[in-house]
């Protein structure tokens, strides 16, 4: 079962792994020493309605916590470096557009399925929550021509972009993995940044991007979890990669 085909919660169409990830973020927020504070995931989980126990267990809490913090740090560093154009690919119930302290000129594009984006935006709007940056939803499936939809929504491929594919790449078929990287590379201006978590036994993303003039680095998932003092038991054997286009 992947994030692309896992069954959704009743009446919402939101896939179970996205909901499980939101539950893990809720648990981290309520822990004694949270790596981040995400007050909005609880709103989304509540709005989604009842879940089966096995659905909530799809995401490993310690791994999700460390991964969320790692991507938070990536975004904040990119923003501090002057990147004002942010693209989140298939973010699910991610709430960074509402919870991170973005600079005033930041524009955040979220590319995801229409029902997912509508559910998230409507739930948070009803709760009186407003984004902390200019928020632009791009309702399109990643299997479709999402670069065209992204450009139509106001994205500028001439400006440096911070790209993020969190919890996505390893769940794509190999052909779609290649297509995703090719499109990101094609629409990335010099100085753009990228962050992804990938399968340790999957394609060599670092090598692929380095061959296309990206300066890349990688960290094994257990090392990221150790950095943030989270238990790696049961966590995927992933690799966190990030880099900058030269």
Swiss-Prot record:
InterPro entries: Ppm1/Ppm2/Tcmp (IPR007213), SAM-dependent_MTases_sf (IPR029063), SAM_mthyl_Trfase_ML2640-like (IPR011610). Its EC number is 2.1.1.-. GO terms for biological process: methylation. The keyword Nucleotide-binding does not apply. One of its GO terms (molecular function) is methyltransferase activity. Keywords: Methyltransferase, S-adenosyl-L-methionine, Transferase. S-adenosyl-L-methionine binds at residues 112, 141-142. Exhibits S-adenosyl-L-methionine-dependent methyltransferase activity. Belongs to the UPF0677 family. This is Putative S-adenosyl-L-methionine-dependent methyltransferase Mflv_0168.
